[in-house]
Amino acid sequence: MRFLAATFLLLALSTAAQAEPVQFKDCGSVDGVIKEVNVSPCPTQPCQLSKGQSYSVNVTFTSNIQSKSSKAVVHGILMGVPVPFPIPEPDGCKSGINCPIQKDKTYSYLNKLPVKSEYPSIKLVVEWQLQDDKNQSLFCWEIPVQIVSHL
């Protein structure tokens, strides 16, 4: 029994250690306050994103409003121009958030950032926004990244 408990604890600690808080720029969170942004794996910044890989994104935020729904909008910003960055699940209510969103409640938003093999090897800024049912930002953050062929 002790072995099982120790194994479970070790597994939980190793999973927690893989989530790296990143330094981010708030790009206009209107209806919420970002507590923390984690991108995994991203041990150093700018995050090195390998083509063909997928990265976990976890945003802890507190909502300042009530909202029936939420929608993620992600862009890669190249030389000041936002380019849509498709993600597998844009519905925030299917990404770790139990909707309706309540005022003054803290949430953990979870999603994936897939990096397609056909993306060029470049430096850019990822802008990730979660919009409420009035298209206002529950959160908006930016981080610099570099897309690379292989790490």
Curated annotation (Swiss-Prot):
<keyword id="KW-0445">Lipid transport</keyword>
<keyword id="KW-1054">Niemann-Pick disease</keyword>
<dbReference type="GO" id="GO:0035578">
    <property type="term" value="C:azurophil granule lumen"/>
</dbReference>
<keyword id="KW-0813">Transport</keyword>
<keyword id="KW-0325">Glycoprotein</keyword>
<keyword id="KW-0007">Acetylation</keyword>
<dbReference type="GO" id="GO:0042632">
    <property type="term" value="P:cholesterol homeostasis"/>
</dbReference>
<feature type="glycosylation site" description="N-linked (GlcNAc...) asparagine">
    <location>
        <position position="135"/>
    </location>
</feature>
<dbReference type="InterPro" id="IPR039670">
    <property type="entry name" value="NPC2-like"/>
</dbReference>
<feature type="disulfide bond">
    <location>
        <begin position="42"/>
        <end position="47"/>
    </location>
</feature>
<dbReference type="GO" id="GO:0019899">
    <property type="term" value="F:enzyme binding"/>
</dbReference>
<feature type="modified residue" description="N6-acetyllysine">
    <location>
        <position position="116"/>
    </location>
</feature>
<dbReference type="GO" id="GO:0030301">
    <property type="term" value="P:cholesterol transport"/>
</dbReference>
<dbReference type="InterPro" id="IPR003172">
    <property type="entry name" value="ML_dom"/>
</dbReference>
<keyword id="KW-0732">Signal</keyword>
<dbReference type="GO" id="GO:0070062">
    <property type="term" value="C:extracellular exosome"/>
</dbReference>
<comment type="function">
    <text>Intracellular cholesterol transporter which acts in concert with NPC1 and plays an important role in the egress of cholesterol from the lysosomal compartment. Unesterified cholesterol that has been released from LDLs in the lumen of the late endosomes/lysosomes is transferred by NPC2 to the cholesterol-binding pocket in the N-terminal domain of NPC1. May bind and mobilize cholesterol that is associated with membranes. NPC2 binds cholesterol with a 1:1 stoichiometry. Can bind a variety of sterols, including lathosterol, desmosterol and the plant sterols stigmasterol and beta-sitosterol.</text>
</comment>
<dbReference type="GO" id="GO:0032367">
    <property type="term" value="P:intracellular cholesterol transport"/>
</dbReference>
<comment type="similarity">
    <text>Belongs to the NPC2 family.</text>
</comment>
<dbReference type="InterPro" id="IPR014756">
    <property type="entry name" value="Ig_E-set"/>
</dbReference>
<dbReference type="InterPro" id="IPR033916">
    <property type="entry name" value="ML_Npc2-like"/>
</dbReference>
<dbReference type="GO" id="GO:0005576">
    <property type="term" value="C:extracellular region"/>
</dbReference>
<dbReference type="GO" id="GO:0033344">
    <property type="term" value="P:cholesterol efflux"/>
</dbReference>
<dbReference type="GO" id="GO:0005615">
    <property type="term" value="C:extracellular space"/>
</dbReference>
<keyword id="KW-1207">Sterol metabolism</keyword>
<keyword id="KW-0256">Endoplasmic reticulum</keyword>
<dbReference type="GO" id="GO:0120020">
    <property type="term" value="F:cholesterol transfer activity"/>
</dbReference>
<dbReference type="GO" id="GO:0010467">
    <property type="term" value="P:gene expression"/>
</dbReference>
<feature type="disulfide bond">
    <location>
        <begin position="93"/>
        <end position="99"/>
    </location>
</feature>
<dbReference type="GO" id="GO:0043202">
    <property type="term" value="C:lysosomal lumen"/>
</dbReference>
<keyword id="KW-0964">Secreted</keyword>
<comment type="subunit">
    <text>Interacts with NPC1 (via the second lumenal domain) in a cholestrol-dependent manner. Interacts with NUS1/NgBR, the interaction stabilizes NCP2 and regulates cholesterol trafficking. Interacts with DHDDS. Interacts with NEDD4L (via C2 domain). Interacts with NPC1L1.</text>
</comment>
<dbReference type="GO" id="GO:0005783">
    <property type="term" value="C:endoplasmic reticulum"/>
</dbReference>
<dbReference type="GO" id="GO:0032366">
    <property type="term" value="P:intracellular sterol transport"/>
</dbReference>
<keyword id="KW-1015">Disulfide bond</keyword>
<dbReference type="GO" id="GO:0019747">
    <property type="term" value="P:regulation of isoprenoid metabolic process"/>
</dbReference>
<protein>
    <recommendedName>
        <fullName>NPC intracellular cholesterol transporter 2</fullName>
    </recommendedName>
</protein>
<feature type="glycosylation site" description="N-linked (GlcNAc...) asparagine">
    <location>
        <position position="58"/>
    </location>
</feature>
<dbReference type="GO" id="GO:0008203">
    <property type="term" value="P:cholesterol metabolic process"/>
</dbReference>
<keyword id="KW-0458">Lysosome</keyword>
<keyword id="KW-0753">Steroid metabolism</keyword>
<dbReference type="Pfam" id="PF02221">
    <property type="entry name" value="E1_DerP2_DerF2"/>
</dbReference>
